[in-house]
Swiss-Prot record:
Subcellular location(s) of the protein: Cytoplasm
Species, as recorded: Janthinobacterium sp. (strain Marseille) (Minibacterium massiliensis)
Active site: 50
Gene3D superfamilies hit by this protein: Hotdog Thioesterase (3.10.129.10)
GO cellular component, one term: cytoplasm
Function text: Involved in unsaturated fatty acids biosynthesis. Catalyzes the dehydration of short chain beta-hydroxyacyl-ACPs and long chain saturated and unsaturated beta-hydroxyacyl-ACPs.
Name listed for the protein in its UniProt record: 3-hydroxyacyl-[acyl-carrier-protein] dehydratase FabZ
Amino acid sequence: MKTLDINQIKQYLPHRYPLLLVDRVLNWESGKSITAIKNVTVNEEFFNGHFPHKPVMPGVLMIEALAQTAALLSFLTMGQKPDDNSVVYFIGIDGARFKRPVEPGDQLKMEVEILRNARGIWKYKATGSVDGQLALEAELMCTMRTINDASPAAGQ
């Protein structure tokens, strides 16, 4: 079983607090799949406004957590770490469905599988679950570019 702790994750993802949304990798297999977790606590910044009377993790951040997990798998598969001259763009999402809320105290378990990698576009099947219950699912697409080649309109 191949695992990564938070210090190892930070070597592969440029994200930092408050947007680093992967706490641990439980297992990964190069070119195939990865399983990771996000421990959701009441101290998350977003709970101050989403929603004070009923805290729920925003869907867009659940998708971002899956996208970060997918990016980790891609970097691990390529055997490289990001550098100051590269950027990974999240370029597409299909079939996103939210099945249950993610709340303080939950552990979001993220499972991502590579569907294909063609012409620099990575496509993944991604799911997130809490206590064995499906919370969200989506197909994600990402690409990596060098800073000099990255068009401002290519992504966020």
